[in-house]
A protein has these predicted regions:
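Hydrophobic/small residue at the entry helix of a nucleotide-binding pocket
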Residues: 175, 198-199
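Short beta-strand element of Class I
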Residues: 213-216
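Residue-level marker of beta-strand positions
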Residues: 70, 87-90, 104, 140, ...
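Glycine-rich cofactor phosphate-binding loops and adjacent beta1-alpha1 units
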Residues: 183-185, 210, 226, 231-298
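NAD(P)H dinucleotide-binding glycine-rich loop of Rossmann-like/cofactor-binding domains
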Residues: 99-192
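Conserved acidic E/D residue at the C-terminus of a beta-strand in Rossmann-like folds
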Residues: 219-220
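C-terminal hydrophobic helical "lid"/dimerization subdomain
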Residues: 1-6, 28-31, 35-36, 299-325
């Protein structure tokens, strides 16, 4: 049997590569064999901002938890109940684990599947309180409900040539798209994306795909702002002050139709407050820059601590708030 290694969270600020058990077709929560699953050999895996929350000690993650929920891999072993996925297939793995059979999955709310985590709705690989599934920052990993959860690339050779792009399909791009979509972006929309990291840039590009007329991207880091500019977005340097003033200079009005929070609760302040953490800053600012009856897409809300947002500040505008589904 092949050896397996994974990246384990040990304590705040400390991770280490460990030898771990080779995966089995096994559900760790119900302790039963799962013939609907497969075992993957990992081709690529990414570091998510959510992983960093754990590593920084911002969650109750236990020592020894194997990290990683952004996975692309090659199918090594197939359970006998799997119909459409074959050994040797190259596949993308959505970060949330879903059964495809429960009411929530049938209503397309796969992020809160009722069957993959006995403790609460919703499950994911390598994350605290999300069902006990081993993470994908490893050499091999188990994926349950393979016919439902895996996206097979039709041409293996072409997939390998584009693997650095396709690796974003497991989390980064769909998360950004979900933020733009739930914010109601459509033809002619004006949009503000708070955060120019990978997910924020994916949200900005998704807003363009959805037909936005103007997309603003706010961040503190010049390289991120330049990247946003490179594909047609208007950069907003929040280290220079409030985004609303800069948006008005470019748009002629101080408000947009839709906004997305792609930063989350480890946000920093604007202008002179940019050197320290201010959890409520981003969400409160997108409420300020969005017009009355506009929509907000909040990608990073699930783990937010008390003080993340002052929702009273948005009450007068009657926003449609769309947290992750």
């Amino acid at each position: 049997m092949a050896e397996n290694r994974g990246v384990a969270y040990m304590k705040p600020g400390v991770v280490e590569v460990q030898s771990i058990d080779f995966p089995k077709l096994w559900d760790p929560a119900i302790k039963k064999k799962i013939e609907h699953g497969v075992i993957l050999k990992i081709i690529s895996t990414n570091i998510c901002g959510s992983d960093q929350h754990m590593v920084r000690g911002r969650t109750t993650a236990p020592s020894g938890l194997i990290l990683g929920h952004e996975i692309t891999g090659e199918v090594l072993e197939v359970g006998r109940d799997v119909l459409f996925i074959k050994k040797g297939d190259v596949v993308s793995v959505p970060f949330n684990i879903a059964c495809g059979r429960c009411r929530n999955c049938k209503e397309q709310n796969t992020g809160i599947c009722l069957n993959t985590n006995p403790e609460r709705p919703g499950s994911a690989y390598g994350y605290v309180d999300m069902g006990g599934w081993v993470g994908g920052q490893a050499e091999y990993v188990t994926v349950p409900y393979a016919d439902w959860n895996l996206l097979k690339f039709p041409d293996k050779e072409q997939a390998m040539e584009k693997i650095l792009d396709l690796t974003m399909l497991s989390d980064i791009f769909p998360t950004g798209y979900h933020g733009a979509f739930t914010a109601g972006v459509t033809s002619g929309s004006t949009v503000y994306i708070a955060g120019g990291g990978p997910v924020g840039l994916a949200a900005a590009y998704s807003a363009q795909l959805l037909g936005a007329a103007v997309v603003f991207v706010g961040d503190l880091i010049p390289e991120r702002l330049e990247q946003a500019r490179s594909f047609g977005c208007e950069p907003i340097d929040v280290s220079k002050g409030d985004p609303q003033d800069q948006i008005e200079q470019l748009l002629g009005v101080p408000e947009v139709d839709a906004a997305v929070d792609a930063v989350g609760f480890e946000a920093r302040g604007h202008g002179s407050d940019a050197d320290h953490e201010a959890p409520a800053t981003v969400l409160n600012s997108i409420m300020t820059v969005t017009r009355a009856a506009g929509k907000l897409g909040m990608i990073s809300l699930d783990e937010a601590p008390q003080g993340y947002a002052d929702f009273d500040s948005g009450a007068a505008k009657e926003f449609v708030l769309n947290p992750p589904g």
